[in-house]
C-alpha cells in the first residue's frame, strides 16, 4: 500500500552499477514529482545533470519542507541498481533544468517506457499540489 516511487539523478552504468535514489512511499505520482522539481527550479538549485549529489540533497529538503518530517511521509535515500523499483509509480530519472527525462516501471521483462505529455487532469493536479506547497512555504516562512 502506498503511492511509491524512486527518483534518481542519473542512471546506473557499467562504471557505476549502483546510484543513489530518493524513495518516496507517499506522493510518488508524476504530479507530485514534477511539482517538487518546479520548486527546485524556481529556487535555482543546481540541477541533477550538473550536480547530482547536490540536487538530491536539495530535493530531499524540499520534500521534507512541504510534506513535513513529523508527518511520517516515508521518505528515504537508498541505492538503485537499474533493475528494481518499488512498485506503484516506478522510477523517475531527472535531468537538466529539473525535468523528468525518463519514467519507467520494471515488469518481469524490465520493459521501460518514456514519459510522455501529461493529460489535462495531470496538469490540474500538478498545479493544485504546487499551490498547496506554496501555501505550506508561506506558513513556514511566517513562523516567528
Describe each PLM feature range.
Residues 1-5, 18, 86-88:
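Short, surface-exposed coil-to-beta transition loops
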Residues 4-9, 92:
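Short beta-strand scaffold segments in enzyme catalytic cores
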Residues 9-10, 25:
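Short His-Asn-centered micro-motif
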Amino acid at each position: 500500500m502506498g503511492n511509491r516511487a524512486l527518483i534518481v539523478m542519473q542512471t546506473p552504468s557499467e562504471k557505476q552499477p549502483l546510484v543513489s535514489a530518493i524513495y518516496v512511499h507517499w506522493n510518488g505520482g508524476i504530479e507530485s514529482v514534477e511539482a517538487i522539481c518546479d520548486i527546485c527550479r524556481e529556487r535555482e538549485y543546481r540541477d541533477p545533470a550538473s550536480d547530482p549529489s547536490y540536487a538530491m540533497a536539495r530535493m530531499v529538503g524540499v520534500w521534507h519542507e512541504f510534506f513535513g518530517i513529523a508527518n511520517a511521509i516515508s521518505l528515504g535515500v537508498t541505492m538503485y541498481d537499474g533493475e528494481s523499483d518499488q512498485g506503484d509509480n516506478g522510477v523517475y530519472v531527472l535531468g537538466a533544468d529539473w525535468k523528468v527525462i525518463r519514467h519507467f516501471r520494471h515488469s518481469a521483462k524490465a520493459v521501460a517506457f518514456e514519459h510522455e505529455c501529461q493529460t489535462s487532469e495531470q496538469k490540474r493536479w500538478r498545479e493544485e499540489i504546487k499551490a498547496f506547497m506554496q501555501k505550506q512555504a508561506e506558513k513556514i516562512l511566517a513562523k516567528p
